[in-house]
From Swiss-Prot:
Keywords from the UniProt entry: Amino-acid biosynthesis, Arginine biosynthesis, Cytoplasm, NADP, Oxidoreductase
Gene Ontology CC, one term: cytoplasm
PANTHER family: N-ACETYL-GAMMA-GLUTAMYL-PHOSPHATE REDUCTASE, CHLOROPLASTIC-RELATED (PTHR32338:SF10), N-ACETYL-GAMMA-GLUTAMYL-PHOSPHATE REDUCTASE, CHLOROPLASTIC-RELATED-RELATED (PTHR32338)
Protein name stated in the entry: N-acetyl-gamma-glutamyl-phosphate reductase
Function: Catalyzes the NADPH-dependent reduction of N-acetyl-5-glutamyl phosphate to yield N-acetyl-L-glutamate 5-semialdehyde.
Cell location: Cytoplasm
Pathway(s) served: Amino-acid biosynthesis; L-arginine biosynthesis; N(2)-acetyl-L-ornithine from L-glutamate: step 3/4
Active site, per annotation: 145
Organism of this sequence: Methanosarcina barkeri (strain Fusaro / DSM 804)
C-alpha cells in the first residue's frame, strides 16, 4: 500500500483529497496535518467522512512526514509549499504540490505572485493529458483549476498551430475561493448574481499562456476573464478561438478525438457540457462548434474545480507516479443532479 500524507488537510482541496483517497484501493492514509487543529479529529472539519476515517490532525516536522509517507500532497497556500519541498524530496518520498509555487518558471512566479522563491527548482506541470512524463517523476506541480479547463479546451487546436487569438471566459463555483469567505463568495453578495473579477490580470492566465505557447510557440494573443457564480462546485469555460484557417465542426471532431485518444477523463457529450454532469468526478467534458463566417471556434469545457481542477488531478498524477492506471480510485460518475 502507498502511504499518503496531506499537508494542509483542513481546507476544501485537503478534504477532497481525503474523500477520494479513503477508498483508493492502493492507498493508506497515514497522516493529515493542520497547525491550528492538531490533536482534533479530521472529521471535526470534514463531517462527510464520519465512519470512513479515523485520523486526528497532526503537526509533524518534515523529517517525520518524509519517514512515514511514500507520497505527500501539499494543499497549502501559495508561497508555503516551497518551505516543505526541499526536505520532503530529500529521500524517496514523492510530492504532488497543489499550490502555485512550482507551476511556472521562477521569474514568472515571482512577478505574478509577488513572492521571492526560496527553492527555484523545476517540476513537471501535472496536466496528464499534455504531460504523460509525470509517470517518471518524483515531484509534480498540480495545475490550477481555471487553467485546467481552459488548456484542455484549446490544446488540440494549439498543438495543430491553428489558433490566432484565444479568449477564455470562465465561470467558477464559490468553493474556488477557498474555505474562508471573501466579498465575492459571501452569500448575500453572490446569490442570484454573477461577479466578474480580475478582468485582465488574473494570475492563472500565466499558466494558460505557458502551456499553450509550449504547444504553439507563436501563439501570444491569449486572454482570460473569470467570474464567480452562485454554485458550490464547477468551472464552465467558453473558449472563443479565432483560427488561422476556416474549420468545420467535422474538422474539430477529428482533431479533438485524435488528440485525446486514450485519455480516459476527457469526454465529448452529445450535447453541451454541464456542471452537474461532472460534479464530484474527475472528468472534463468538452464540446465545440465552428463559426465559419468569422473563422472562430467555440469550445465549451466543464470540470469540477475541486476534483479535476485540484484533488482528483493530483491523485491522477500520483497514480502514474507509482505505476498505477491513472483511473485508479477515480473512476466514478458524477453526483448529478
Amino acid at each position: 500500500m502507498i502511504k499518503a500524507g496531506i499537508i494542509g488537510a483542513s481546507g476544501y482541496t485537503g478534504g477532497e483529497l481525503l474523500r477520494l483517497l479513503v477508498n483508493h484501493p492502493n492507498v493508506k492514509l497515514e497522516l493529515a496535518t493542520s497547525r491550528s487543529l492538531a490533536g482534533k479529529p479530521v472529521t471535526s472539519t470534514h463531517r462527510h467522512l464520519e465512519g470512513f476515517l479515523d485520523l486526528n490532525y497532526e503537526n509533524p516536522d518534515s523529517e517525520d512526514i518524509r519517514e512515514r509517507c511514500d507520497v505527500v500532497f501539499l494543499a497549502v497556500p501559495h508561497g508555503s509549499a516551497m518551505n516543505y519541498v526541499p526536505e520532503l524530496l530529500d529521500g524517496n518520498t514523492k510530492v504532488v504540490d497543489l499550490s502555485a509555487d512550482y507551476r511556472l518558471e521562477t521569474s514568472e512566479f515571482e512577478k505574478i505572485y509577488g513572492i521571492k522563491h526560496s527553492d527555484p527548482r523545476n517540476a513537471v506541470y501535472g496536466l496528464v493529458e499534455l504531460h504523460p512524463e509525470v509517470a517518471k517523476e518524483n515531484f509534480v506541480a498540480n495545475p490550477g483549476c481555471f487553467p485546467t479547463g481552459s488548456i484542455l479546451a484549446a490544446a488540440p487546436l494549439a498543438a495543430a498551430g491553428l489558433i490566432d487569438i484565444a479568449v477564455f471566459d470562465s465561470k467558477t463555483g464559490i468553493s474556488g475561493a477557498g474555505i474562508s469567505p471573501t466579498q465575492n463568495s459571501h452569500y448575500p453578495n453572490l446569490a442570484e448574481n454573477i461577479i466578474p473579477y480580475k478582468l485582465t490580470a488574473h494570475r492563472h492566465r500565466a499558466e494558460i499562456v505557458q502551456e499553450l505557447t509550449g504547444l504553439e510557440g507563436k501563439l501570444r494573443n491569449i486572454n482570460f476573464t473569470p467570474h464567480v457564480i452562485p454554485s458550490i462546485r464547477g468551472i464552465f469555460t467558453t473558449a472563443h478561438l479565432f483560427t488561422k484557417e476556416t474549420l468545420s465542426t467535422d474538422d474539430l471532431k477529428t482533431i479533438y478525438e485524435e488528440f485525446y485518444r486514450d485519455r480516459p477523463f476527457i469526454r465529448f457529450p452529445s450535447g453541451v457540457p454541464s456542471l452537474t454532469a461532472v460534479r464530484g468526478s474527475n472528468f472534463c467534458d468538452i464540446s465545440f462548434e465552428a463559426d465559419k463566417e468569422n473563422n472562430r471556434v467555440v469550445v465549451l469545457s466543464a470540470i469540477d474545480n475541486l476534483v479535476k481542477g485540484a484533488s482528483g488531478q493530483a491523485i491522477q498524477n500520483m497514480n502514474l507516479m507509482f505505476g498505477l492506471d491513472e483511473t485508479c480510485g477515480l473512476w466514478m460518475p458524477a453526483t448529478a443532479p
